Amino acid sequence: MHHALCNVIEPIVDRTFVDSCYANRIGKGTHKALDHFTALARRYRYCLHADVEKYFPSIDHAILRERIRRHIKCPNTLSLIDAILENSNEQEPAAHYFPGDDLLSPYDRRKGLPIGNLTSQLWANLYLARADHVMAQRFGGTRYLRYVDDIAVFSDSADELTDARTLLKDELALLRLNLH
């Protein structure tokens, strides 16, 4: 069922991803990401490497649903997606607070995707797509790359990478995510 669903939605959402988003994409696997990373490492003096803390367990269902609904309009497909999300892994309480939260917000929000499902991998790329666009626009699509939840930005300026980390943290906070 997950493969059939991905066959329907992947062509719709994949075209919205930046070119430097790797993993779980046709023609954009580990080797392509490593080649891109290596080329950038040889060209630039500094690299910001960032990792999203507990990425799959932290994906917020309400935010993910909103992202999915921007691209998928078929009620039957959305119903299937909702069923998959509702029946996904049990949630572990995580006391991460974000601007606007009340005391119970971290416990009231359903989170998490099972790592092995094909739908989870596609949705993980979609979840970070807006952050990818913001980072690629600010730092150039050729100096930014992401492989699942591992993010790299390259520059000849350490100060620019400090700015990149701040911008990335701000974008991730909008998704209720933290950096390691």
Regions found by a protein language model. Name each.
Residues 25-30:
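Active-site beta-loop-alpha junctions of metal-dependent nucleic acid enzymes
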Residues 2:
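"…together with the soluble PPM/PP2C metallo-phosphatase catalytic core" -> "…together
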Residues 19-20, 34, 39-148, 152-179:
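Conserved polymerase palm-domain catalytic core
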Residues 11, 15-20:
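Charged boundary/loop elements
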